[in-house]
């Protein structure tokens, strides 16, 4: 899991770790979508 301050913090980690193209920052944790 990746901590974040905003959705912009999540895009690269989501792509690198999961291959998911979409992401959001929810409760200071990245959520990855579109896997």
UniProtKB/Swiss-Prot annotation:
Tissue distribution of the protein: Expressed by the venom gland.
Site (Basic residue of the functional dyad): residue numbering on this chain: 24
Subcellular location: Secreted
InterPro entries given in the database record: Scorpion_toxin-like_sf, Scorpion_toxinS_K_inh
Effect seen on changing residue 31 to A: 294-fold decrease in inhibiting Kv1.2/KCNA2 channels. 479-fold decrease in inhibiting Kv1.2/KCNA2 channels
Top-rank taxon: Eukaryota
GO MF terms held by the record: ion channel inhibitor activity; potassium channel regulator activity; toxin activity
Secreted keyword on record: yes
Site note Part of the basic ring which may anchor to the external vestibule of the K(+) channel, residues: 5, 12, 28, 31
Cellular component aspect of the GO annotation: extracellular region
Impact after mutating residue 33 to A: 500-fold decrease in LD(50), 600-fold decrease of potency in competition assay with apamin, and 17,000-fold decrease in inhibiting Kv1.2/KCNA2 channels
Record-linked Gene3D superfamilies: Knottin, scorpion toxin-like
Pfam family, one: Toxin_2
Presence of keyword Magnesium: no
Consequence recorded when altering residue 12 to A: 51-fold decrease in inhibiting Kv1.2/KCNA2 channels
Site annotation Aromatic residue of the functional dyad: residues: 33
Effect of residue 24 to A: 500-fold decrease in LD(50), 600-fold decrease of potency in competition assay with apamin, and 17000-fold decrease in inhibiting Kv1.2/KCNA2 channels
Note: Pi1 analog that is synthesized with a phosphorylation at Tyr-33 (P-Pi1) suffers a 200-fold decrease in LD(50), a 200-fold decrease of potency in competition assay with apamin, and a 58-fold decrease in inhibiting Kv1.2/KCNA2 channels.
Recorded domain comment: Has the structural arrangement of an alpha-helix connected to a beta-sheet by disulfide bonds (CSalpha/beta).
Protein function: Potently and reversibly inhibits the insect voltage-gated Shaker (Sh) potassium channel (isoform alpha (B)), the mammalian voltage-gated potassium channels Kv1.2/KCNA2 (IC(50)=0.44 nM), and the calcium-activated potassium channel KCa2.3/KCNN3 (Kd=330 nM). Its effect on Kv1.3/KCNA3 is controversial, since this channel is voltage-independently inhibited in PubMed:9464266, but is not affected in PubMed:10931199. Furthermore, this toxin competes with apamin (a small conductance calcium-activated potassium channel inhibitor) for binding to rat brain synaptosomes.
Family: Belongs to the short scorpion toxin superfamily. Potassium channel inhibitor family. Alpha-KTx 06 subfamily.
Record-given protein name: Potassium channel toxin alpha-KTx 6.1
Native source organism of the sequence: Pandinus imperator (Emperor scorpion)
């Amino acid at each position: 899991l990746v901590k974040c301050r905003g959705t912009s913090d999540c895009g690269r980690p989501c792509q690198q770790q999961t291959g998911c193209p979409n992401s959001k920052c929810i409760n200071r944790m990245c959520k990855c979508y579109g896997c």
